[in-house]
Amino acid sequence: MRRNAILLSAIAVSALAAIAAFAQAQGGNVRAEDVTFLGQPVTRLQIVRGREIYAQNCASCHGANLEGQPDWKRRLESGRMPAPPHDESGHTWHHSDQDLFAITKLGVGGVVPGYESDMLAFGEILSDEEIAAVLAFIKSTWPERQRDAQARIRAKEGGG
């Protein structure tokens, strides 16, 4: 009995250490405490979870490395815009957290009536917490300059 308890404890400690190491390796070079979403600090676990959700739901259009589709500033034959990058080369950081959350949840057309986009509305696919985790992951990849610029936009628009 005691032997099983020791074995289970050792397994639990090993699993926690592995999760912590994985979380640290997955989150980029930014410390989690340097990233906020809707004015609240995010955790390393949120960033790691966001990266996983991004890979499953967003990378097929926005790129595995957040690079967006090629020639993303030029309209497609359909008249729609390609998926933009979410790294510092794109314009994601030009928008407040509230706007990014709304666009992800409702789709671009749900935020800008009449705008046609290939972007899905993820509100029925992902929970609010999952959307927030994806956005925390994206923000964790931005250099300090972009995070600071986006923070000024959030402050100007009321903190979101």
Region annotations inferred by a language model:
Residues 30, 44-45, 51-81, 105-115, ...:
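Periplasmic/extracellular electron-transfer cofactor-ligation site
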Residues 24-53, 148-153, 157-160:
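Electrostatic cytochrome c docking/interface patches
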Residues 1-4:
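Positively charged n-region of N-terminal signal peptides that target proteins for export
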Residues 124-160:
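A charged, solvent-exposed segment within the mature domains of Sec-exported extracytoplasmic proteins
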Residues 75-139:
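Extracytoplasmic electron-transfer domains, predominantly the class I c-type cytochrome c fold
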Residues 10-24:
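Hydrophobic alpha-helical membrane-insertion segments, chiefly the h-region
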Residues 43-46, 96, 127, 143:
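General structural signal for secondary-structure boundaries
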